[in-house]
Amino acid sequence: VIELIMDGVAAGRNWTVLKGNHDRMFDWFMQTPLRQDPHLQIGHSWLHPRLGGDKTLASYGIDASEGRRLYEVQREAFDAIPPAQIAFLRALPLTYQHANWFFVHAGIRPNIPLSEQLEDDLLWIREPFLSYQDRHPLMVVHGHTALDAPAHFGNRINLDGGAGYGRPLVPVALNEKTMRPLC
């Protein structure tokens, strides 16, 4: 998937690709020393089956099954994964602003200027963002918290239809005030 996206961007397609928490976890796994995201539950790492790192590495032919030594899996990853793909993930922007829209992976911390948002919040926040009902400076378009279908909440639009849980991606069309699923 990373190669497909990189090829599209290189070909000049008008795609905006934002960094998500799983992209950062992949990048951090590929660093020496290996970095662990502090937002993960104790006992979990990016390689935990719930987080998808094991499947990501399997797509490169790497066995990350339980019982293997982390340093061995990481060494195999260094050999198998093109450095350009990790550089691409590392360089992805955290946000994108267009007109009255503010696109971000997880959300924002309410009442903090958009220019002062922390990376951890942009990639991981749930509360107090999800329960905040007042207006944000811009309409926030996000994912990270799966719903049955995309939903408009007045001050934010959650586009996460649960693809991380095996459900299909849900493309949407956005105009100044509305959101319409395309399928």
PLM region spans:
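Acidic, His/Gly-enriched loop-helix segments that form or flank divalent-metal centers
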Residues: 40, 49-51, 55-158, 162-168, ...
